[in-house]
């Protein structure tokens, strides 16, 4: 089953980004891909919130979104908009929303990013996604030609409980469109995505933003496809482009037969915490070391 990943350096104009995506979708369809994947914030990357807000709209009034719905229907291809900012009617904050469009031009699924990127990096970069966005509340699974697909976005990948829930639901594919910073990408990107694939025995598809953006932000790139064994099938490096890869969907069954993590999975109760009074009593009565006696956790000569 052939898929196409679009690694982008999105700019501050949604319609320019949408035009780039339309060309890529058409090429993906011509190359025989059944599904096209774009990164997080595919339609807009802009740190200037006031400037960016003038482009915000709900789904029916987003010209960029409607243009992508039309091109998906024209080329009869599944389209995964990794994410885009959506201002739902009456909402004070935006949703960072992943949207899947079916080949008939209907929206098959929506997922709002659950974990918002509020961090202070050692490099000096500070991010407060929650200042403009509201986190989603619900994991989403959608049926696609690739099988059952669990949706997530970028920072979500650091929270394994979400993927445990997806694994319990029997997903075959996980999507993780992203816009990683360079420092966190160099340190964690490949490791996290391979871990999510291995623990779920599922394909992981992660289209990414890359290079230096119009607003000055730099993103890591390295869009990845990882198979259920944890092998990297595609790594797009650090420049924008479109790439296709063929997935052997039978690999899901083979891996799960070899290492049946789903069948062996147990419901884990909360751990028993140590009784602090009992622990203190043990420390208080523990006797002699080479240098003296431990009394209430302190070393005395």
Label each residue range with its predicted role:
Residues 209-300:
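C-terminal beta-strand edge segments of enzyme domains
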Residues 7-13:
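Short polar catalytic/cofactor-binding loops
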Residues 89-169, 182-186, 191, 258-261:
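Active-site catalytic loop in hydrolytic enzyme cores
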Residues 81-83, 97-100, 140-142, 223-225, ...:
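Short beta-strand scaffold segments in enzyme catalytic cores
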Residues 14, 22-104, 110, 181-196, ...:
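Cys-nucleophile CN-hydrolase/nitrilase-fold catalytic domain and related Cys-dependent amidase chemistry
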Residues 1-4:
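Extreme N-terminal starter segment of soluble prokaryotic enzymes
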Residues 16-25, 158-164:
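Short, acidic/polar
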Residues 59-80, 148, 157-243:
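CN hydrolase (nitrilase-like) catalytic-core segments centered on the catalytic cysteine
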């Amino acid at each position: 089953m052939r898929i196409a990943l679009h690694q982008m350096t999105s700019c501050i104009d949604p319609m320019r980004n949408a035009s780039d995506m339309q060309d890529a979708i058409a090429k993906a369809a011509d190359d025989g891909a059944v599904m096209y994947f774009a990164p997080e914030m595919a339609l807009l990357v802009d740190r200037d919130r006031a400037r960016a807000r003038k482009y915000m709209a709900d789904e029916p009034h987003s010209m960029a979104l409607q243009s992508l719905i039309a091109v998906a229907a024209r080329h009869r291809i599944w389209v995964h908009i990794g994410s885009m900012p959506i201002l739902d009617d009456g909402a004070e904050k935006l949703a960072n929303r992943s949207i899947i469009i079916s080949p008939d031009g209907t929206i098959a699924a929506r997922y709002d990013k659950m974990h918002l990127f509020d961090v202070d990096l050692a490099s000096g970069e500070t991010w407060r996604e929650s200042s403009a966005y509201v986190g989603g509340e619900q994991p989403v699974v959608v049926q696609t030609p690739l099988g059952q697909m669990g949706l997530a976005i970028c920072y979500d990948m650091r929270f394994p409980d979400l993927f445990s829930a997806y694994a319990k639901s029997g997903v075959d594919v996980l999507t993780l469109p992203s816009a990683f910073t360079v420092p966190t990408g160099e340190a964690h990107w490949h490791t996290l995505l391979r871990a999510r694939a291995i623990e779920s025995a599922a394909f992981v598809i992660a289209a990414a933003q890359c290079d230096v953006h119009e607003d000055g932000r730099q993103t890591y790139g390295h869009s990845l496809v990882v198979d259920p064994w944890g092998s990297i099938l595609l790594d797009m490096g650090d420049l924008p482009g479109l790439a296709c890869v063929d997935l052997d969907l039978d690999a899901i069954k083979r891996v799960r037969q070899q290492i049946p993590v789903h069948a062996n999975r147990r419901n884990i109760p909360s751990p028993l915490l140590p009784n602090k009074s009992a622990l203190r009593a043990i420390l208080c009565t523990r006797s002699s070391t080479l240098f003296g006696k431990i009394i209430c956790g302190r070393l005395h000569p």
